[in-house]
A protein has these predicted regions:
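Short, acidic, metal-binding catalytic loop of nucleotide-sugar glycosyltransferases
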Residues: 20-37
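Short acidic, S/G/P-rich loop/turn micro-motifs used as interaction or catalytic elements
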Residues: 12-17, 47-48, 100-104
Length: 128
């Protein structure tokens, strides 16, 4: 059984160059780590994935990216993510996170935590 994680996040075209680079770097890092099976990116119909992602990722890691489109001029809601997970990712280990969160070995700590069963749980990571 493949118990790696499916990460879900949102991508939007930030007008701030530094912020845009930070978001792209997080997506890149999350695609490279072995603990992720897929990275589902929610973005509107008018937004394109930055070409820099395909330039820096291997073909195998780039294929982890799955784009889910939604109507223009609308940000994704928690309901959008939960509905998508229920319809398309039943039985998967899913994590919803802000688009600027990058993971390393932390995902193994979640998956291997004692006295914590991932089954029937949905993990959402954000910051205050």
């Amino acid at each position: 059984m493949d118990n790696r994680f499916v990460l879900m996040t949102e991508y939007f075209n930030s007008s701030h160059t530094g912020r845009k680079k930070e978001i792209i770097k997080s997506i890149e890092v999350n695609c490279r780590i072995p603990e992720t099976k897929r990275v589902v990116i929610f973005m509107d119909c008018d937004t394109e994935l930055p070409s820099s992602l395909s330039d820096v990722l291997s073909e195998e890691n780039y294929k982890k990216i799955e784009v889910n489109r939604f109507p223009i001029q609308r940000r994704s809601t928690y309901s959008d993510f939960f509905s998508y997970a229920n319809q398309h990712l039943a039985g998967e280990n899913c994590i919803l996170c802000n688009n600027d969160i990058s993971f390393g070995g932390d995902l193994d700590e979640i998956r291997l935590a004692k006295n914590f069963e991932l089954n029937q749980h949905f993990i959402c990571l954000t910051r205050c």
